[in-house]
Amino acid sequence: MKMTYASALEALSALEALDGENTIIRDGGREQVIRKPYQFSAATRMAIARNLCALQATRDVFTLARNDAIRRISGGKSTVPDDLRDDFASEMADLARQETDVALARVIEADLNLAENRLPPTVLAALLPLVDA
């Protein structure tokens, strides 16, 4: 699937949010936060895992390009000087708009089990490029 690096990173963040929902449990006077896993079929969980791996590799490529830009703009240093931050920001915006081809598994909307899984709309919006109705 062709997508920009920006949309790939957004999809990765959304997929990482599919591990579960934080829930507060009260035991007497004590509160504890636990992560309640979302309920997906085995096939959907595997599609999510495959997509995570593919998008993590894409993030790694983006990170290498980002680090190269930092070194190039800063003259070999690990941080961008204040007077060159605009140049760096412009280069990162250009990089984020570049297209990459990522092998992603499609997910069926019904398999997200939205009646049971309270996925935030922001997560759903980021997942839309991967979801078939």
Predicted regions mapped to residue ranges:
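N-terminal interaction modules that seed assembly of large macromolecular complexes
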Residues: 2-4, 8-65, 69
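Low-complexity intrinsically disordered segments
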Residues: 56-133
